């Protein structure tokens, strides 16, 4: 069976000093088809990053399972590339060598890994900076290096953990467009987490809303805006359209309602 499948996932952490365990995720079921761009939206503490870490294989669930193409995810693997909010680049390596680092660990010959790394840099528009030092790049450019590095191993799934959270507003918007452009050309399966309603609406082909206490998937919506941008290449027109604004207000109201329900309960 192809695709990513999450079944009855629960993650609980031991309580401090004998306290009851903290349940971060409970009863999470999610299926992601190949080529989908799925965005998980929710406030801090709703378990978004915990869910991504389970998919990445960084942590094992207390109950339930994650399967990729029918096989259980038991640890990290080259079939899943991760882009972090903090760029996690190696400052002693130049841009090209940072992108090629995972391939080096896989013992890919130097000429081949540099060819692949340069190809990925072209994909994100940084081929002219291949031999630049990463600390000399802007935040947005460093995040592009992170995306290129995650793609270099040709993963089936790209996992993006609030990768634009540390960027200024203008850079964030240009990065959103870049991410959609890369997705449109590669059609990788993407799981992206954010707490920004507008970002979620713009990027997602399918949006899942998560709520805390413990983290669960409350709602799921199919959305047209990512495909609309790829057709028109006009992000401002997409984000200022009547249906985008209507969706944004609907989601903000829904999130407030969910948060109020959690406070009352």
UniProtKB/Swiss-Prot annotation:
The keyword Membrane applies. Residues 6-237 form the ABC transporter domain. Belongs to the ABC transporter superfamily. Taurine importer (TC 3.A.1.17.1) family. It catalyses: taurine(out) + ATP + H2O = taurine(in) + ADP + phosphate + H(+). This is Taurine import ATP-binding protein TauB 1. It comes from Paraburkholderia xenovorans (strain LB400). It is found in: Cell inner membrane. It is a peripheral membrane protein. One of its GO terms (cellular component) is plasma membrane. GO terms for molecular function: ABC-type taurine transporter transporter activity; ATP binding; ATP hydrolysis activity. Coiled coil: none annotated. The complex is composed of two ATP-binding proteins (TauB), two transmembrane proteins (TauC) and a solute-binding protein (TauA). ATP binds at residues 42-49. It is an enzyme of class 7 (translocase). InterPro entries: AAA+_ATPase, ABC_transporter-like_ATP-bd, ABC_transporter-like_CS, ABC_transporter_ATP-bind, P-loop_NTPase. Its EC number is 7.6.2.7.
């Amino acid at each position: 069976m192809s695709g990513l499948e999450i079944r009855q996932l629960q993650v609980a952490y031991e309580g401090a000093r004998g306290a009851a365990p903290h349940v971060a995720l409970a009863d999470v079921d999610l299926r992601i088809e190949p080529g989908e761009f799925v965005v998980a939206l929710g406030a801090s503490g709703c378990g978004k990053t915990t869910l991504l870490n389970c998919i990445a294989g960084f942590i094992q669930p207390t109950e339930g399972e994650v399967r990729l193409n029918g096989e259980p995810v038991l640890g990290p693997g080259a079939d899943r590339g991760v882009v972090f909010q903090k760029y996690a680049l190696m400052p002693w390596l130049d841009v090209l060598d940072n992108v090629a680092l995972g391939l080096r660990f896989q013992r890919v010959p130097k000429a081949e890994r540099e060819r692949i790394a340069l190809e990925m840099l072209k994909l994100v528009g940084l081929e002219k900076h291949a031999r630049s030092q990463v600390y000399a790049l802007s935040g947005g450019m460093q995040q592009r290096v992170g995306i290129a590095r995650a793609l270099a191993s040709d993963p089936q799934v790209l996992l993006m953990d609030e990768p634009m959270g540390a960027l200024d507003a203008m850079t964030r918007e240009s990065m959103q467009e870049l991410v959609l452009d890369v997705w449109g050309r590669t059609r990788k399966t993407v799981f992206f987490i954010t707490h920004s309603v507008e970002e979620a609406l713009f990027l997602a082909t399918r949006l899942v809303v998560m709520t805390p206490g413990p983290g669960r998937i409350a709602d799921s919506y199919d959305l047209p805006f990512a495909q609309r941008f790829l057709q028109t290449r006009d992000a401002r027109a997409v984000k200022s359209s009547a249906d985008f604004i209507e969706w944004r207000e609907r989601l903000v109201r829904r999130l407030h309602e969910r948060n109020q329900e959690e406070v009352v309960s």
